[in-house]
């Protein structure tokens, strides 16, 4: 796995990133995620796709996109106003 996995709580659970955040990618806007980016003054993530954690429906792996290309990754917990990143996207996730 890429550096992203080493920096995330995923490493503790011994699950792969794909198991922790199973497909599919959701491409629709999520007001909670959008608000979390706004509150954290994150630029460059106006368009994104995300996966919901298998362990918590309020935890998301978010990939920011620009021009159809993934540029950066974040962990987002909107319910507790927490955001971690940016991280490089993991190329093993389709």
Language model regions located:
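N-terminal processing/targeting junctions
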Residues: 8-13, 43, 83
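Bacterial N-terminal signal peptides
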Residues: 1-9
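Short, non-transmembrane alpha-helical segments in secretory-pathway proteins
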Residues: 14-49
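Exposed beta-strand-loop-beta-strand "reactive/processing" segments of non-cytosolic proteins
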Residues: 44-76
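A short, surface-exposed interaction/processing loop segment used at functional sites
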Residues: 75-94
